[in-house]
Amino acid sequence: MKPSEPKSVPSSFFDETFRQSSDPWRYTSNFYEISKFRTTIKCLPKVQFKNAFEIGCAIGVLTQKLAKKCDRLLSVDYSEVGLEEARKRCADLPQVRFEQMQIPQQFPTEKFDLILFSEVGYYLTMPDLLIAKQKIIDQLLPGGYLLMVHFRYPVESFILNGDIVHDTFIQESAQFLKHLGDPRQQKFWIDIRGYHKRYRMDLFQRL
């Protein structure tokens, strides 16, 4: 019998994770996560964006910070349980819209000048990652930006790892995306705690 093909991590995994804890990855209390979110916002290539798309918003901690840079922001997650917390957290941000989506099977049809693909790609199989990549390219406006952020090391629930996710975009998208490198390197920051080594960050611009 042929072994079954691996599948991307389902929404039920994230629903159960958020039922067990309202903040399972300690976004609000872990200094590594707090520092990473702060760095992500500082590495945005523009002061303000007209229409942004956040893939994998979880409970909306980064969404709160990102919304200040966006006239409109669509934030999606696999988990409706996580989105309930996100909606409460961002209730005073009228420019933010939340939707439950199973990326890449579900994907918005509108165009964006910023797409943030953060800590999601390694939950996908390679075929699904390639589909997501193409849909991101299709919905990114010419001159628009894609910022990717992913943890680099193995975790039991991951199908891929952060380096594979980012390298796939670099190697497979040169015709459509200009790779601008790691924006942290342009800031000349001193990474005293060594946090930057733990996650990958790459910025792209749509050709």
Where do the protein language model's features map onto the residues?
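Class I (Rossmann-like) S-adenosyl-L-methionine-dependent methyltransferase catalytic domain
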Residues: 1-47, 51-55, 59-110, 124-138, ...
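Hydrophobic adenine-recognition pocket in adenosine-nucleotide-binding enzymes
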Residues: 120
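A conserved beta-strand element that flanks and buttresses the S-adenosyl-L-methionine
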Residues: 116
